[in-house]
Amino acid sequence: MRVVLDGVRPWRHDLAGCLHACLGTLVEHAGFAPLEVLGASWQFYYRLGDLRSEEYYFPCPDGRSLVASLAPGHPIGSRWHLPADAEQGWQQVRRQILAGTPVAVAVDNFELPFRPAYQDVHSNHLVVVHGFDDERQSARVLDAIPPFFAGVLPLAVLAAARDSGNRSSH
């Protein structure tokens, strides 16, 4: 089976990183204007003592989901999935794509051949997965952060990037 979702477009703002870029792509696909949605909560908030390694970390001030915190007043939310293994993780992503929803996926730049940190530096990052080809064992990936990437990754590469030794805490 081969599926590529229509209408998944890259979104990026110069003042934002991979978190906002991925969410901009996802909220636009859901029919919202990314800058209006994400700009509603454009702020700097820091929870004292809460240090994380994820580039995309955003402390949610009142326990709301990440997306609900970034997009107050909009009927959207998010949920982190922590799969038991790479296969379970891929099946979760695949199900969402089959349902018509692109997925933000946490990865390690060290394992992604299109990232400048490839095989050099471990760094948590987010990309959007919006398609797959079962026969070719590949996924369609979008990364609006320079250097821009919109293309096909072998599932083995995506699995390595999702399951690297670079641990994160969401």
Predicted region positions:
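Noncatalytic regulatory segments and standalone regulatory/sensor domains
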Residues: 133-170
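Active-site-adjacent substructure of cysteine-protease-like catalytic cores
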Residues: 30-53, 85-141
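Cysteine-nucleophile protease catalytic domains, especially the papain-like/related folds used
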Residues: 1-86
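Hydrophobic transmembrane alpha-helix bundles
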Residues: 70-83, 118-122, 142-148
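Residues that form generic nucleotide/phosphate-binding pockets
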Residues: 25, 29, 96, 161
